[in-house]
Amino acid sequence: MGTFFQKIADYSKDAVSAGKYLLQGLAVTFDHMRRRPITVQYPYEKLIPSERYRGRIHYEFDKCIACEVCVRVCPINLPVVDWVMNKETKKKELRNYSIDFGVCIFCGNCVEYCPTNCLSMTEEYELAAFDRHSLNFDNVALGRLPTSVTSDPSVMPLRELGYLPEGVMDPHELPKDSSRAGKLPIEIMDWMKNKESNKSEDNNLDININSLKVEKDSK
């Protein structure tokens, strides 16, 4: 008889414990239900990279002096600088420059220590390819002008996940009806146009006032 009641007590204890853990899981679920959605519908939606994002490296052939500083400061000696010595001018002549982005860790040392600023970091991060050999960019591919996420009209950049208002550290703390942080390029252009038009109207008003003053003084 005592064994029967002991089994009932153990079963009740396990049931209470299971219910407790179930409620804890539901509490986490309900907490996430009240949060803002963070799913990015890539590639139709993209995050705006930060201002100092280290993306694809941009290279300017005309500025390079083949000093190979980028090779020495690279942790894996990645950049390949092909040059020959000109016996007449006794200077290096650059033939080719390449970086393999399949191996690059995007540390930015080459950009930081370049004496002529021929290297710069862009905000391009879509470098995936089917063939890893296609990730070996030569000076022509590196010299291609970088593309911006905000310049693609088919993409809606998610500003609230890229920049948060001052003092906000968690994007889930923002109310659902709050305005997004930052502005789209189109909104910035409209704002600049309105500002210029208002400025021109103010200038015209000042000119009219000054002309009236001159006429009054002449009379």
Curated annotation (Swiss-Prot):
The protein's Enzyme Commission number: 7.1.1.-
* GO CC field: plasma membrane-derived thylakoid membrane
Its subcellular locations are: Cellular thylakoid membrane
Cofactor dependence is on: [4Fe-4S] cluster
Task: Reply yes or no: does the keyword Metal-binding apply.
Answer: yes
Q: EC class of this enzyme?
A: translocase
The protein's name in its UniProt record: NAD(P)H-quinone oxidoreductase subunit I
